[in-house]
């Protein structure tokens, strides 16, 4: 995987872990905040998927 993409993926994973830990510790003041945090985690997961797809495509293009 490209070094830049690896760094971005790692940062996304770190943020996901921070948010998951915060939810586990009861950081959400109410249900709306809980939903917002869960939405952020979901968005980060989608972004990570895009990065992994891009890295895969870049590797396939380099093989051609």
Outline where the language-model segments fall:
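Sequence-pattern detector for short linear motifs
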Residues: 12-14, 18, 38, 45, ...
């Amino acid at each position: 995987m490209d070094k830049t993409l690896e760094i971005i993926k790692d940062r996304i994973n770190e943020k996901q872990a921070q948010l998951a830990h915060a939810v586990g510790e009861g950081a959400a003041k109410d249900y709306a905040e809980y939903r917002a945090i869960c939405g952020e985690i979901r968005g980060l997961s989608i972004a990570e998927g895009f990065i992994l797809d891009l890295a895969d495509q870049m590797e396939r293009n380099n093989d051609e």
